[in-house]
Amino acid sequence: MSLLGKRIRAPREDDDLLDEGLSSSEELNSASGGDEDGELEDAETVRVPFLIYDDKELLEIADLPPIGQSDLEDSPSEKEGENDIESSLSQISFGALAKVQRSLGPLKKGSKRKHRGQEEEEEEEEQDNGNTKYKKSKLDALNELRERIRRAKEGKASKSGQSKDEEAAVKKQKESRLSKHAPAIQSSKFAVSRRRVVVDGENVAQVKSRDPRFDSAVQSYSHSHRLGSHSDPAAAKNYAFLNDYRDAELKELEEKLRRAKNEDEKQQLKKTITSMNDRKRALEHRDRERQILSKHRKRERELIKEGKKEKAWFLKKADLKKEALKEKYESMGAKQRQKGIERRRKKVASKEKKEMPRSRRMVEG
């Protein structure tokens, strides 16, 4: 009896059946009022419903490993236990079996013991149901996750739209100047046009013929290089006829400007005339400075020869400019001198105003 309790354990799904068998056996014992042998016999019949399975099924229900030949050989105690189980099973009477059957009640129609194949099919169905439930729960979780992602994207899109508007407002505020005198802020980025300009004759700079004797590179030499130097009086004297040519060309351009009717042509002629006048004034100013410098050198040499000076005094650039300006105003007429002085005064005042600090400039302005 003790060996049966140790080796044979009912599965979880048969717990209810075990409870029913125990309760029915107790009722039968109390009703019969038998002796101790009868009580023992009834107690033994409690485990009878679970002994209708064969040995392999009992081992599978109890989750025990199958008993092999090696196990029987290695464990003689287990062999003796099995012999005891077989002897106890052979000693159970048919009356005890009938009592237990009556206590359990009649078997329902179609409630026969299920075969192992049917049990496996039911287990597979339960697994399929569990898989379908798992799949459904997984699909629900995926749908919920997609909904959250969609909401997050919508919120992000709305925030990005607001941020773009704010950035545009900040950019517009930055572009506005603090003062009308401040330079305008303009981005250096610009869209590159897909249209490409093909190099043609109009866009190519025309090669101008030049005379190396009057080239600026040649004329920029120091005073030691006499040939080609702008301070060389011999070169200025030899090419003095070029000034007459320039004056004649200037008169022709002024006549063309007077007769021209096209606005573009007029603008081009005006630009050329202004450039020639500026060059003429620059040449006159240079000739004036050259004459002043030559006079100063001649005077210093005479003083040294007379013994009034031991060393020559070289004229500075600032003093040279002052002497040239003085000689310029002396050669002018009264009206021209007045206009020139007024123009000079405005130029100096504008220059001083630019160099003045901003606070003082605003007060005086």
UniProtKB/Swiss-Prot annotation:
GO cellular component: 90S preribosome; nucleolus
Positions of the UniProt region annotated as Disordered: 1-43, 62-90, 103-191, 258-299, 329-365
Subcellular localization: Nucleus, Nucleolus
A GO BP entry: maturation of SSU-rRNA from tricistronic rRNA transcript (SSU-rRNA, 5.8S rRNA, LSU-rRNA)
Complex formation: Associates with 90S and pre-40S pre-ribosomal particles.
Stated role: Component of the 90S pre-ribosome involved in the maturation of rRNAs. Required for early cleavages of the pre-RNAs in the 40S ribosomal subunit maturation pathway.
Matching PANTHER family: RIBOSOMAL RNA PROCESSING PROTEIN 36 HOMOLOG (PTHR21738:SF0)
Protein name in the entry: rRNA biogenesis protein RRP36
Gene field: RRP36
